[in-house]
Amino acid sequence: RISVLKEVIAKVYKTRLPNLHIYISQKDVNEYLSCLSRETKRFLYPQATILYVDPYDFGTVHIPTLRTFCEKFYCELLFNLFTSDWVRNRNNELDSRIDKVIDNPKVKINNKTELVDYMLKQLKVGRMQYSFNYEFHTETNVELYQIMYLTPKDTGLEKLKDALWDTFKGA
């Protein structure tokens, strides 16, 4: 991934687009989002941000922190939701990461569908109006994760549909 990103960034900087700024950090995702949320000018409307959150596992991203960013800024969000981690660890009393991620003791999630619905409800805030989930499975058809895409504009969904169609050759 890093080599692909470096290649893309090199091409972007070579063309010198004055209205495109790339912000990269190697901080913990929650620290990173908190830092970005404190920015007052760089990410406010009419600036458009594409936020790609690909955590190490389900317990990594604090959803209220991600929600705050989505509420405050005009952005599109690509979020990797590790549903397999949740399914595997939901009944594990020792794994408090799930509770920490959700950060709401009143919320009880009983199955994967409720988890996805809860996440969408939490992230469809601010200008976010449209969403799309795409499940990724193993060769034995076990779901590993879902890519959640949220956007303020329906044209974002159209572009995503076209990209998925091109990538997966209509399959």
Question: Residue ranges of each PLM-predicted region?
Answer:
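Short catalytic-loop micro-motif centered on adjacent basic/acidic residues
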Residues: 22-23, 50-54
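SAM cofactor-binding core of SAM-dependent methyltransferases
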Residues: 1-35
